[in-house]
Design a protein with these regions (language model features):
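Conserved N-terminal beta1-alpha1 strand-loop-helix module at the mouth
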Residues: 1-90, 97-125, 141, 151, ...
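A short, flexible beta-alpha/helix-coil linker loop
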Residues: 13-14, 132-134
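Glycine/threonine-rich flexible loop motifs
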Residues: 136-138
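Conserved cofactor-binding/catalytic machinery of classical short-chain dehydrogenase/reductase
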Residues: 148
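Internal alpha/beta core interface subdomains
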Residues: 179-181
Length: 204
């Protein structure tokens, strides 16, 4: 079973003014002690995504485990450590056949029914959310809440990542409700190094 770090930052180019700002933020996160990052780009520009992914790998690959969102082909091309798929992406077992047994595979879920189904796959970890209301995604699913997270914890022994509206103020309660890790986007954008250090301190 994989061992997830408490903090699971997600880097999305849409949150930055340009790629250089994103790369600088990634290096700040690594300097703060972050050991895992997901690169998520929904633009559909595969060439740019691959260039960015390779640059992140070159800058961080020695110290940070890198997860590619959605794109199994880019995961392999950029030599990333794992792939994360959502409910509208490749099915978990199809993704597994592409990336092989050694790379990590994560699956997003948005309710306990989806989580129970994902738990039957070869996914190494599962994500559930949104735990709280979030502004990072336009087409959000209904809020799961801490109670939904507790139910999810009862349904799986796989490592569980909570996502959606998680801040330094509520992160500890999310861990106490059963999450192994918290995925964060927005609350790391302002001063990434300081924010990550504060998250890591809160998460313990």
């Amino acid at each position: 079973m994989v061992s997830l770090p408490r903090l699971y930052p997600i880097l999305d180019p849409a949150c930055f003014s340009d790629a250089a700002e994103m790369f600088a933020a990634a290096e700040d996160l690594a300097a703060a002690g972050v050991t895992l990052l997901q690169y998520r780009d929904k633009s559909g520009n595969a060439r740019r995504m691959l260039d960015n992914a390779r640059e992140l790998k070159q800058r961080l690959g020695a110290t940070v485990k890198l997860i590619m969102d959605d794109r199994a082909d880019l995961c392999l091309a950029a030599q990333y450590d794992g792939l994360h798929v959502g409910q509208d992406d490749l099915p978990a077992e199809s993704a597994r056949r592409i990336i092989g047994p050694a790379r990590w595979l994560g699956v997003s879920t948005h309710n306990t029914e989806q989580l129970a189904e994902a738990g039957k796959t070869s996914a190494d970890y599962l994500a559930i959310g949104p735990i709280f209301a979030t502004s990072s995604k336009a087409d959000t699913d209904p809020v799961v809440g801490l109670e939904g997270l507790r139910r999810a914890r009862e349904l799986t022994s796989k490592p569980l990542v909570a996502i959606g509206g998680i801040t330094r103020a509520n992160a500890r309660s999310v861990i106490e409700a059963g999450a192994d890790a918290v995925a964060v986007i927005s609350d790391l954008l302002r001063d990434p190094r300081k924010s990550a250090e504060e998250f890591l301190r809160v998460l313990g």
